[in-house]
UniProtKB/Swiss-Prot annotation:
Belongs to the SELO family. Its cofactor is Mg(2+); Mn(2+). This is Protein nucleotidyltransferase YdiU. Nucleotidyltransferase involved in the post-translational modification of proteins. It can catalyze the addition of adenosine monophosphate (AMP) or uridine monophosphate (UMP) to a protein, resulting in modifications known as AMPylation and UMPylation. It holds the Pfam family SelO. Keywords: ATP-binding, Magnesium, Manganese, Metal-binding, Nucleotide-binding, Nucleotidyltransferase, Transferase. ATP binds at residues 84, 86-87, 107, 119-120, 170, 177, 256. InterPro entries: adnlytase_SelO (IPR054838), SelO (IPR003846). The lineage of its organism: Bacteria, Pseudomonadati, Pseudomonadota, Gammaproteobacteria, Enterobacterales. Mg(2+) binds at residues 247, 256. GO terms for molecular function: AMPylase activity; ATP binding; magnesium ion binding. The gene is ydiU. Its EC number is 2.7.7.-, 2.7.7.108. It comes from Escherichia coli O127:H6 (strain E2348/69 / EPEC). It is an enzyme of class 2 (transferase).
Length: 478
């Protein structure tokens, strides 16, 4: 089957990019590819059998027209000016059978005009982390970019140490970022901001294109998508680590996996990025940061969208966030209905977990085994202050009995939203260290496991992290 690529971005937004081709690596070789995703995109298996090929930027497929995008942004709350694709190249937009499109974005593809002081490369460590994280999030049901392939090489890349140069093929319906809009707003080119908005609506919100107030409706949906995404992050204990405006997806996708981390111990102020000295992007601050980022996006639209309309959309953020978060947390607790005491029970559990530094994922997974008429709980042994747990658990069981469902029905619901497996940093690190020695077994094994996060397991993928695996320091270095 011949893949079809179109050039909407190149043709319709000529001032938002520089056309250029990838720069191949030395002795590049394909070490992993996503068979399930490749099948979904109707990619012939033969493309994965001819060396690095397109996956390593050594050749292009018919119809591809590679380019690096320019955008700007606020980083850690400070205007950073022009940024852009410093190491990535958008190879093309694949046209799928249903009429939708999928960007093919090659990360680590070499120098671009937007590389600033960088070398345009990515390292094996960071490409493995992003591939694992994006696929883990996908199978958790959270909107995200996807990973299609990883190529490693003999090219040295200099970071804190010398590492192997690598490339990641990332795919997404769009790489539109808040930062694209900021770039032209701060260049005082509002007509180009409007062109971006029209492009987004025409291709991704086409049902709004003929509406008189399409910009208000569109921005309201961007707010809702962002609020929903952040709510989902919070419910699974995911910390992004670098929520700069240039890393915010207009479509509400999880984008740009760098120093991310899933909670091990329940620590509301968890900071996964060791460069985040002020804790701006701490786990519990993510909802507020996302709203701040939306406010920056709204500012770029103010030359052609009424400020009252923008503020009305922004005002809807908190309610959308709380609605999505509340619904999912009730499911995680096994509540089939909404009762007035639900929030108090959840907050009391969180307080107990924070005091005891309980494992976030294991706590909710073990809670899924609760039988409403049994005072015994396997979760009890996870707590030191068992009297406090017993007090909470007794009230929790009373609450469960208000919903007229069987234990098996409730447990089935809870186990479908409380994962047994999340991508803990130590699991990724173990796969990385093996891969850096040439052994890809753990990389493939972990990828396969992450496809079934809600299935029970009896291996160390679902155990508490070892001492060396806690508080692993992760930076933006990639």
């Amino acid at each position: 089957m011949t893949l079809s690529f179109i050039t909407r971005w190149r043709d319709e937004l000529p001032e938002t990019y520089t056309a250029l081709s990838p720069t191949p690596l030395n002795n590049a070789r394909l070490i992993w590819h996503n068979t399930e995703l490749a099948n979904t995109l109707s990619i012939p298996s033969s493309l994965f059998k001819n060396g690095a090929g397109v996956w390593g930027g050594e050749n292009l497929l018919p119809g591809m027209s590679p380019l690096a995008q320019v955008y700007s942004g606020h980083q850690f709350g400070v205007w950073a000016g022009q940024l852009g694709d410093g190491r990535g190249i958008l190879l093309g937009e694949q046209l799928l059978a249903d009429g939708t499109t999928m960007d093919w974005h090659l990360k680590g593809a070499g120098l671009t005009p937007y590389s600033r002081m960088g070398d345009g490369r990515a390292v094996l460590r960071s490409t493995i982390r992003e591939s694992l994280a994006s696929e883990a999030m996908h199978y958790l049901g959270i909107p995200t970019t996807r990973a299609l392939s990883i190529v490693t090489s003999d090219s040295p890349v200099y970071r804190e140490t010398v590492e192997s140069g690598a490339m990641l093929m990332r795919v997404a319906p769009s790489h539109l970022r808040f930062g694209h809009f900021e770039h032209f707003y701060y260049r005082r080119e509002p007509e180009k901001v409007r062109q971006l908005a029209d492009f987004a609506i025409r291709h991704y919100w086409s049902h709004l294109d003929d509406e008189e107030d399409k910009y208000r409706l569109w921005f309201t949906d961007v707010v809702a998508r962002t609020a929903s995404l952040i709510a989902q992050w919070q419910t699974v204990g995911f910390a992004h680590g670098v929520m700069n405006t240039d890393n915010m997806s207009l479509l509400g996708l999880t984008l740009d996996y760098g120093p991310f981390g899933f909670l091990d111990d329940y620590e509301p102020g968890f900071i996964c990025n060791h460069s985040d000295h002020q804790g701006r992007y701490s786990f519990d601050n993510q909802p507020a940061v996302a709203l701040w980022n939306l406010q920056r996006l709204a500012q770029t639209l103010s030359p052609f969208v009424a400020v009252d309309a923008l503020n009305e959309a922004l005002d809807s953020y908190q309610q959308v966030l709380l609605t999505h978060y509340g619904q999912r947390m009730r499911q995680k607790l096994g509540f089939m209905t909404e009762q007035k005491e639900d929030n108090a029970l959840l907050n009391e559990l969180f307080s107990l977990m924070a005091r005891e530094r309980s494992d976030y994922t294991r706590t909710f997974r073990m809670l899924s085994l609760t039988e409403q008429h049994s005072a015994a709980s396997p979760l009890r042994d996870e707590f030191i202050d068992r009297a406090a747990f017993d007090d909470w658990f007794a009230r929790y069981r009373v609450r469960l009995q208000q919903d007229e469902v069987t234990d098996s029905e409730r447990q089935q619901l809870m186990q479908s939203v409380n994962p047994a497996l999340v991508l803990r940093n130590w699991l990724a690190q173990r796969a990385i260290e093996a891969a850096e020695k040439g052994d890809m077994t753990e990389l493939h094994r972990l990828h396969e496991a992450l496809r079934n996060p809600f299935s029970d397991r009896d291996d160390d993928y679902v155990s508490r992290p070892p001492d060396w695996g806690k508080r692993l320091e992760v930076s933006c270095s990639s």
